[in-house]
Amino acid sequence: MDREFIRNFSIIAHIDHGKSTLADRLLEVTGALSQREMMEQVLDSMDLERERGITIKAHAVRLNYRADDGKLYQLNLIDTPGHVDFSYEVSRSLQACEGALLVVDASQGVEAQTLANTYLALHHNLEIIPVINKIDLPAAEPERIREQIETVVGIDARDAVLCSAKQGVGIHDILEAIVHLVPPPKGSPDAPLRALIFDSWFDSYRGVIILMRIIDGRMKLGQKIKLMANGQVFEVEGLGYQAPKATACSELQAGEVGFLYANIKTVGDAKIGDTITEVENPATEPLPGFEEIKPMVFAGLYPVESHEHGLLRDALEKLRLNDSAFNFEPENSAALGFGFRCGFLGLLHLEIVQERLEREFNIDLITTAPGVRYRITDTSGNLVEVDNPTKFPDPSYIETIEEPIIDASVITREDFLGGILALLEEKRGTQKKFEHIGAGRVMLTYELPLNEIVLDFYDRLKSASKGYASLDYHLSGYRESPMVKLDVLVAGEPVDALSIIVHKDFAFERGKALISRLRKLIPKQMFEVALQAAIGNKIVARETISAMRKNVIAKCYGGDISRKRKLLEKQKEGKKRMKRVGRVEIPQEAFLSVLKVSQSSDDD
């Protein structure tokens, strides 16, 4: 098809602002699916995506639309994940487009996520079409939202399209706006081939299937292609596009979006953001913006039943086939046995992987407290990266420790400011910006350590704001901080899986809170058990679990005190001997308690 009639666009929206429903309506109106095949959220094919109401993987669907001017246009809708964990995938999907629909809920207004993705879209010079959705709601205030889009996002919203995706109102106007406002793709079909990979997944019959947008040149069946990041060469075995069912074709050219498979074995080979070129006539430079995705959050995953270790490894291998951002390596813990140290993009990613393991592979898991990657310079000047408390070096060898810092923006209502500011303060945040964005809403920009966010920040932010605050963050760099490793000793033995890395100023309180929580969770033994929190050799907190004891003097009626004393001394001697050889079983809840330590102690 002539490039003049191709439009590539994506939909930007905050979670729950109606992005997937709008995509459904666009498919329905353009006749991509018959009534019989329509179901809610056609593009969210994973069960988890539907249940949580989020989009995890990107999709690309071709719609054929005959506009009011009588011409037939090819619209490529590239559906992007909306969550902050997947922001790199979003930026690559946006790079494949020339325009974006900015969908805002008519009752809720602009949220932090919408803002972050809009800035990404502006960064890629996309044409942004504001769409105000859910105008059928009784609480809808389209005029107020128009002003808000102009003040907060800074784009002209006078011509914003009003629609209700649920009732199918205004869909025609959106399609017309795409045709008239989004520019056709640039790039020449005669230049050397350059195609951008913006998603890939694994198919057990065809290997890796790559979703791509052809920027320059053309791609044909049987052509030899090369991936520019790692230099690997493959032969194109299949080409096609989703409409939304996969439809095969023999050639794709500049401006078009489609998929290819070429007997690629792992998703790790076809990295998101990489450039595909041809072997015969290669492009001189790759497309800009490619970076290796680095995990930001780390946690240990262990099977509850130790014999399921092999099953867990197979399950993780299968997940990695589809998720190149997820990585893992085996680790061994004295307390939990064999398991894996896994790296994730963020907390949502961690939850999704955990849930998929439990749901699709039926494995019961113990997850250790999530942590982040620290940079440590030792006394001899070497730089090491540590993401596991057990690998934390001896304090005497450490010169400096740097922790990852994020820039977070929070949008909330003024009524909840007090609680949110207190929470940000408690999490060692420094305020960078504070602005009113109209209609009683405030936007806060803070610099926070990533370490403080990974435990329970999001949940507490939601409770402090009764669910009204929205959060977006991105990594901004590293900063030197006095971090220490807090060890937990149970009956004098350190339990590696309970160790955490904390800021020196909070180590005492954290240690105290953790020990008092463990005391409630570890059952009484036949002997006295000491629980201690230690930093290096210094004990900062201690609790004692008293022993269960039998009343040995119950059978003595009256009589001499020395008889009773003899029995009590005998019992004491036995308990002492037991304490020397006894082992304490730590229940699974105890490991989960580490996660809850930073919550205020009043909810105990």
UniProtKB/Swiss-Prot annotation:
SUPFAM superfamilies recorded: EF-G C-terminal domain-like, P-loop containing nucleoside triphosphate hydrolases, Translation proteins
Localisation per UniProt entry: Cell inner membrane
Signal peptide: none
One GO CC term, this protein: plasma membrane
Class of the enzyme per the UniProt entry, highest EC level: hydrolase
The tr-type G domain, residue ranges: 4-186
One record GO biological process: positive regulation of translation
GO MF term list: GTP binding; GTPase activity; ribosome binding; translation elongation factor activity
Keyword Cell membrane: yes
Membrane topology: Peripheral membrane protein
Keywords: Cell inner membrane, Cell membrane, GTP-binding, Hydrolase, Membrane, Nucleotide-binding, Protein biosynthesis
Known catalytic reactions: GTP + H2O = GDP + phosphate + H(+)
InterPro entries named in the record: EF-4 (IPR006297), EFG_III/V (IPR035647), EFG_V-like (IPR000640), EFTu-like_2 (IPR004161), LepA_C_sf (IPR038363), LepA_CTD (IPR013842), LepA_IV (IPR035654), P-loop_NTPase (IPR027417)
Record bears the keyword Flavoprotein: no
Pfam families: EFG_C, GTP_EFTU, GTP_EFTU_D2, LepA_C
Residues bound to GTP: 16-21, 133-136
Catalytic activity, EC: 3.6.5.n1
Similarity field: Belongs to the TRAFAC class translation factor GTPase superfamily. Classic translation factor GTPase family. LepA subfamily.
NCBIfam families (alphabetical): lepA (TIGR01393), small_GTP (TIGR00231)
Physiological role: Required for accurate and efficient protein synthesis under certain stress conditions. May act as a fidelity factor of the translation reaction, by catalyzing a one-codon backward translocation of tRNAs on improperly translocated ribosomes. Back-translocation proceeds from a post-translocation (POST) complex to a pre-translocation (PRE) complex, thus giving elongation factor G a second chance to translocate the tRNAs correctly. Binds to ribosomes in a GTP-dependent manner.
Protein name: Elongation factor 4
Species whose genome carries this gene: Solibacter usitatus (strain Ellin6076)
